Amino acid sequence: MSARVLVADDSSTMRKIIIRSLQAVGVPEAVEASDGNEAVNLFQPGKFDMVLTDWNMPGKSGLEVIQSIRSQDPNVPIIMITTEAEKSRVLQAIQAGVSDYLVKPFTADTLREKLEKHGCG
């Protein structure tokens, strides 16, 4: 798998877990963003094959990250990875333009399924 993934999460521990999970499923390159503002600044259309973002981050929230990225690239897959599992939150993310939703904690196999579902596997 040669996908390039942008990983946005304010927890350095969570970013490491996500990146290890990506490596375990064959994603060789992940770029880290420690908050929503950094994620938006790093994103450029065509630079990433997928974006993984947390919901609650300083600066821009995951929803704001999704909206900003969607305004630049309506087709890049964006997966929200969060502890927010309530239906209303999932609906908010869908309305913002998220491609998929993954609740923490997750397994590498579940992440692989999401990547494959969105053409990054």
Predicted features and spans:
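Acidic catalytic/metal-coordinating carboxylates
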Residues: 35-38, 61-64
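Conserved acidic segment of CheY-like receiver
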Residues: 3-13, 18-22, 51
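C-terminal output helix
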Residues: 106-115
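Active-site beta3 strand of CheY-like receiver
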Residues: 46-52
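Short hydrophobic/Thr-rich beta-strand motif most characteristic of the beta2 strand and flanking loop
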Residues: 27-34, 42
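Receiver (REC) domain active-site loop signature in two-component systems and cognate sites
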Residues: 57
